[in-house]
Structure formats: structure tokens, C-alpha cells
UniProtKB/Swiss-Prot annotation:
Listed name of the protein: RNA pyrophosphohydrolase
Motif (Nudix box): 38-59
Organism of origin: Pseudomonas putida (strain ATCC 47054 / DSM 6125 / CFBP 8728 / NCIMB 11950 / KT2440)
GO biological process, any: mRNA catabolic process
Function, as annotated: Accelerates the degradation of transcripts by removing pyrophosphate from the 5'-end of triphosphorylated RNA, leading to a more labile monophosphorylated state that can stimulate subsequent ribonuclease cleavage.
SUPFAM superfamilies: Nudix (SSF55811)
Keyword tags: Hydrolase
GO-annotated cellular components: cytoplasm
Gene Ontology MF term list: mRNA 5'-diphosphatase activity
């Protein structure tokens, strides 16, 4: 599902542990790291997509996490021209994302990257909250900055 402006609705997932670190995942067979994210199907709410993607990409269930916050609006990034599939219709020029800040309430041993036939990640680690800003691919950096900045107060004020 792509909106009239060419952006695909998507959810981004910032999963934290009790130390305030975030789960940082390595794309399969690449030296590229990112937060889990994924598209929102036409029949899903952003929260529905969050739980589906959380399970598909990191093997966690609804009961394994607590939602701490969500960005108020959509955060958008454009794909570099080399990644735009110009021959597909409708044309997708980027993603518009709702970002969720989650806290892991179960054991981290439950994190699994291999539950689907086509895993997106082959490794993960805990990193400091702001670490991803200096590591993510350039075209996603501003969205990461905005999401982390908006959601940070909720992490710092949680009970």
C-alpha cells in the first residue's frame, strides 16, 4: 500500500532493555545495521503492524514487550534514486513511519531472528540509545534523529 505521494506506510521499532539500551539489528548478509521496521498492510493499524513485525523480525510476542510511546505523526524518508524501483506501479519513493518505543519485559533469550523462512536480520546487540544515529545509512538518519528525540523523554521518565 503506497499513499498518493509515493510513500509506503511503515512502523519502526525501538526496543529497549532495563538499562535503557536499544536493540540494534544487523541486516542479513550485510554489514548494515538498523532498527526493526516493516510495512503496514491495508487491513492493519500501526499497532497491529508493530506486533506482526516484532514477531517476524525479532521473534517476540505482544506479551514480551510494553509500549512506552509512539511518535505523534508520520516521519518520512525518501529513498536514494538508485533504490527506487522506477518500473513498479504505484511508484514508491520512500517510507512514512510511525515509531514505537518498547520495553522488553521478558528475557532477552526470547529474541530470535530466524523464525521466518526469509529472515531480515542475522544478528543483534544492545547499544546505547543515541548510538544508531552515527551508524544508520545516511538517508534514514534524519528520521532516526527525529524519532529518538521525540521518544527519549518517555524512556527517561518511565516508572
Amino acid at each position: 500500500m503506497i499513499d498518493p505521494d509515493g510513500f509506503r506506510p511503515n512502523v519502526g521499532i525501538i526496543l529497549t532493555n532495563d538499562a535503557g539500551q536499544v536493540l540494534w539489528a544487523r541486516r542479513i548478509n550485510q554489514d548494515a545495521w538498523q532498527f526493526p521496521q516493516g510495512g503496514i498492510n491495508p487491513d492493519e493499524t500501526p499497532e497491529d503492524a508493530l506486533y506482526r513485525e516484532l514477531n517476524e523480525e525479532v521473534g517476540l510476542e505482544r506479551d514480551d514487550v510494553e509500549i512506552l510511546a509512539c511518535t505523534r505523526g508520520w516521519l518520512r524518508y525518501r529513498l536514494p534514486q538508485r533504490l527506487v524501483r522506477t518500473h513498479s506501479q504505484p511508484l514508491c519513493i520512500g517510507q512514512k513511519q510511525k515509531w514505537f518505543l518498547l520495553r522488553l519485559v521478558s528475557n532477552e533469550q526470547r529474541v530470535r531472528m530466524d523464525l521466518t523462512g526469509k529472515p531480515e536480520f542475522d544478528g543483534w546487540r544492545w547499544v546505547s540509545y543515541w548510538y544508531p544515529l552515527g551508524q544508520v545509512v545516511t538517508f534514514k538518519r534524519e528520521v532516526y534523529r527525529r524519532a529518538l528525540k521525540e521518544l527519549a523523554p518517555r524512556l527517561l521518565t518511565r516508572d
